[in-house]
Amino acid sequence: MVLPGHVAAQNRRARHEYFIVSEVEAGIMLVGTEVKSLRVGKGNINEAFAGPMQGELFLFNAYIPEYQSKMPFPHETRRPRKLLLHKREMAKLMSAITKDGMTLVPLDIHFGQRGIAKIQLGLAKGKKLHDKREAIKERDWNRDKARLMRDKG
């Protein structure tokens, strides 16, 4: 069971694949069995992305499996889910997506203090292969540096 403030689903590849320029927290419209499934810790947003549809922002390709119970209430597992944002925030994000060629990547789905499902979105720009290699080299160097300092001191 996922407690308030804890992460229900996380996109661990997002920070490796993209430069995260800014982060935004949004509400997400879910049906009851989707919420129950997320509370159990099921759900996958590794292949998900957010984008405009009919003047609104939606989360596409997020996988939330059906909740297993005695009374099945089936829902579509990869349906587009509406994101709940203020109009100003939505306009800012839509202009960044269309004009600047950026992407909205879901970073995690968590439950707020009142038990409401929230999604953390990152406004991101894609990394090239050499950027990924540079990040790996820097991470390895920091790890080696910490190891040297620990062994020496």
Swiss-Prot record:
UniProt keywords, alphabetically: Cytoplasm, RNA-binding
Pfam families: SmpB (PF01668)
GO BP: trans-translation
RNA-binding keyword on record: yes
Principal subcellular localisation of the protein: cytoplasm
UniProt GO MF annotations: RNA binding
GO CC, any one term: cytosol
UniProt-annotated location(s): Cytoplasm
Lineage: superkingdom: Bacteria
HAMAP family assigned to the protein according to its UniProt record, in alphabetical order: SmpB (MF_00023)
PANTHER family noted in UniProt: SSRA-BINDING PROTEIN, TMRNA-BINDING COMPONENT OF TRANS-TRANSLATION TAGGING COMPLEX
The protein's role, per its UniProt record: Required for rescue of stalled ribosomes mediated by trans-translation. Binds to transfer-messenger RNA (tmRNA), required for stable association of tmRNA with ribosomes. tmRNA and SmpB together mimic tRNA shape, replacing the anticodon stem-loop with SmpB. tmRNA is encoded by the ssrA gene; the 2 termini fold to resemble tRNA(Ala) and it encodes a 'tag peptide', a short internal open reading frame. During trans-translation Ala-aminoacylated tmRNA acts like a tRNA, entering the A-site of stalled ribosomes, displacing the stalled mRNA.
Family: Belongs to the SmpB family.
Name of the protein: SsrA-binding protein
Phylogenetic lineage: Bacteria, Pseudomonadati, Pseudomonadota, Alphaproteobacteria, Rhodospirillales
